[in-house]
Amino acid sequence: MLYHGVDLVEVRRIRQAVMRYGQRFLARVYTAAERADCEIAPQVMRYEALAARWAAKEACAKALGIGLRGLGAFTVDYPRAGLHDIEVVRDAAGRPTLHLSGVAAQTANALQIRALAVSLSHTDELAIASVVAWVDLSGV
């Protein structure tokens, strides 16, 4: 069985948040590893890289069927992961991967998710992320 989440983010929204709140926004939303990874991106693509990671966090939360704390009011009472509970990191080959902790990891374990795949893309205006979660039902 597969669970899928996708999210689209306007790069300008992330740029505006960084310009307005600076390091406070960056530290609240992104882990130290994510911030460091985006810092090595060429200056012209830094906001796109940040927006793609934001989209990945949202897409992963959607695939897991949970919300993200700090992203507005929810009318349904369900688990909400912290923004640092879903981390976008690179593997040895440079591909984006997801590292889960906290509520996100607990939910993935409860759903018996065996693997997560993330794909990121962006233009200068939009960033998109797609997350597929694979559940092995062969033992059921």
UniProtKB/Swiss-Prot annotation:
Compartments, as annotated in UniProt: Cytoplasm
GO cellular component, one term: cytoplasm
Catalytically driven reaction(s): apo-[ACP] + CoA = holo-[ACP] + adenosine 3',5'-bisphosphate + H(+)
Keyword Lipid metabolism: yes
Organism: Chloroflexus aggregans (strain MD-66 / DSM 9485)
Protein name per its UniProtKB record: Holo-[acyl-carrier-protein] synthase
Alphabetical GO biological process terms: fatty acid biosynthetic process
EC top class, as a word: transferase
Enzyme Commission code: 2.7.8.7
UniProt entry keywords in alphabetical sequence: Cytoplasm, Fatty acid biosynthesis, Fatty acid metabolism, Lipid biosynthesis, Lipid metabolism, Magnesium, Metal-binding, Transferase
Taxonomic placement: Bacteria, Bacillati, Chloroflexota, Chloroflexia, Chloroflexales
Reported function: Transfers the 4'-phosphopantetheine moiety from coenzyme A to a Ser of acyl-carrier-protein.
InterPro entries assigned to the protein according to its UniProt record, in alphabetical order: 4-PPantetheinyl_Trfase_dom (IPR008278), 4-PPantetheinyl_Trfase_dom_sf (IPR037143), ACPS (IPR002582), Ppantetheine-prot_Trfase_dom (IPR004568)
Binding-site residues for Mg(2+), renumbered to this chain: 7, 58
Entry similarity comment: Belongs to the P-Pant transferase superfamily. AcpS family.
GO molecular function terms listed in the Swiss-Prot or TrEMBL record: holo-[acyl-carrier-protein] synthase activity; magnesium ion binding
Keyword Repressor part of the UniProt annotation: no
